């Protein structure tokens, strides 16, 4: 990480929102010597990185993000002593399992050589696709987790990535001979919330696969709240303060400060700061587009899920969707504003490897599917049908469940507009101008946006907040 010279005169910063990006921004500002206050509307800090008893007492569920390849692989988080504040990463033997209808599962192995062997006829093609970036992860991660366009620091590496990343997932999948490998890649690419025939869907698929081999897909012991608690603990050591149950409806409600960083999406920024921003910038924010939402279920279980494919118990994360064609149809339906009859389901079973999540012998599971933004459709039956498809009898072991519609999610985290967990659709049009061509800067010199609606986008990595704070500090240092 690049150091920033400390200011000789004491300056104050206010940060709105205590999600990972807000806390990252606050830490960067505090490291530069600013007095920092963070204001959080909810009673618990963390935004999408919170852990709560959502079903039964003693069962700990992640409200938002649960599995963190970009958390453990974040250049900024890796530069902080978060382990000293209780953050411990837990890895399952394999990062991901993708069960199929024949009673087997295709596994995304952690080691590339194991992946080559397990993917059989496609093993070599898979390694060709991801090996350069896995082997040079420490160079690759900072490249992909910074604002674009940018002059690459490792041009040959990024040129090679770009040759594949500009393709759709559908095109990349044609490199594989086996339907099993195509299905595996479809599930990875579906994290894009794009149709799998769209440009950038292939890039997201690669960006999910590469860290699986480079750093894994771990969970924090005790839940995602552990990430938040570690960030808050380190911020407190630097002198920063987090004020929970402190919603900010207008910048006028903030104490006097030199700079404000907003871990909010464009819609909230308009409401909070619109009066301080010029009309042209406000119109740009109004044109920002949100992506599909999610319908989420948290489960308290009597026992572990009995998967037909026993190897599924080796992974924390499962992708439930069958073949490439089925997943592609599901994502295309959602992208077109419809609900998939057989939705692609993402499922995490962290308590298999972290006993602190549930009472002895019991388990927690987290699952969601994609839906149109703002959907009011109850997807419970369809999600459970997909789980039962690969784990018959699943419903019989459910002690309690809690569902979250798009509106429910937004009520608990205002950044999840219409249930969008990515901070806005990440298509070609919104890849560079996110949320505008100015990215973190606004039309007001002392106001910045630092949420997942800025580069590099969604995920618990803190890099949006890191880059926004660096931008603000550079401007302050130059008196601009």
Where are these regions (language model features)?
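Extreme N-terminal leader/targeting segments of oxidoreductases
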Residues: 1-13, 31-32, 429-431, 477-480
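Rossmann-like flavin
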Residues: 101-200
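Helical element adjacent to the flavin cofactor pocket in flavoenzyme catalytic cores
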Residues: 207-248
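A conserved FAD-binding loop/helix module that cradles the flavin
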Residues: 452-473
């Amino acid at each position: 990480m690049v150091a920033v010279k400390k200011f000789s005169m004491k300056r104050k910063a206010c940060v709105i929102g205590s999600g990972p990006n807000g806390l990252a921004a606050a830490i960067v500002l505090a490291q530069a010597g600013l007095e920092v206050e963070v204001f959080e509307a909810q009673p618990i800090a963390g935004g999408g990185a919170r852990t709560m008893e959502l079903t039964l007492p003693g069962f700990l569920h992640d409200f938002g993000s649960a599995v963190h390849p970009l958390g453990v692989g974040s250049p900024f988080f890796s530069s902080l002593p978060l382990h000293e504040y209780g953050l411990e990463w837990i890895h399952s033997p394999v990062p991901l399992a993708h069960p199929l209808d024949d009673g087997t599962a295709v596994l995304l192995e952690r080691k590339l050589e194991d992946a080559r062997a397990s993917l059989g006829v496609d093993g070599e093609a898979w390694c060709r696709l991801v090996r350069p970036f896995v082997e040079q992860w420490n160079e690759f991660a900072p490249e992909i987790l910074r604002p674009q366009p940018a002059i690459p620091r490792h041009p040959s590496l990024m040129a090679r990535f770009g040759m594949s990343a500009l393709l759709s997932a559908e095109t990349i999948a044609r490199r594989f001979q086996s339907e099993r490998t195509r299905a595996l890649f479809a599930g990875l690419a579906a994290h894009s919330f794009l149709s799998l025939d769209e440009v950038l869907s292939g890039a997201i698929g690669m960006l999910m696969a590469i860290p699986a081999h480079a750093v894994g897909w771990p969970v924090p012991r005790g839940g995602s709240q552990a990430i938040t608690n570690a960030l808050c603990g380190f911020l407190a050591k630097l002198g920063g303060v987090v004020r929970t149950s402190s919603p900010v409806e207008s910048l006028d409600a903030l104490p006097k400060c030199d700079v404000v960083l907003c871990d909010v999406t464009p819609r909230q920024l308009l409401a909070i700061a619109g009066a301080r921003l010029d009309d042209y910038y406000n119109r740009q924010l109004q044109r920002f587009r949100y992506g599909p939402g999610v319908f989420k279920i948290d489960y308290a279980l009597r026992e572990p899920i009995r998967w037909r494919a026993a190897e599924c118990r080796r992974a924390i994360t499962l992708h439930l969707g069958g073949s490439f064609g089925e997943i592609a149809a599901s994502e295309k339906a959602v992208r077109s504003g419809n609900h998939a009859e057989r939705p692609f389901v993402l499922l995490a079973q962290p308590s298999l490897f972290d006993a602190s999540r549930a009472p002895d012998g019991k388990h927690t599971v987290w699952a969601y599917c994609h839906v149109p933004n703002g959907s009011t459709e109850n997807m419970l039956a369809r999600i459970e049908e997909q789980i039962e498809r690969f784990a018959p009898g699943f419903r019989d072991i459910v002690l309690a469940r809690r569902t979250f519609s798009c509106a429910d999610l937004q009520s608990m985290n205002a950044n999840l507009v219409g249930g969008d967990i990515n901070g806005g659709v990440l298509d070609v049009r919104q890849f560079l101008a996110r949320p505008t061509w100015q990215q973190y800067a606004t039309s007001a010199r002392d106001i910045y946006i630092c949420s997942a609606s800025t580069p590099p986008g969604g995920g618990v990595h803190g890099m949006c907040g890191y880059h926004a704070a660096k931008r603000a500090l550079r401007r302050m240092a130059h008196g601009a």
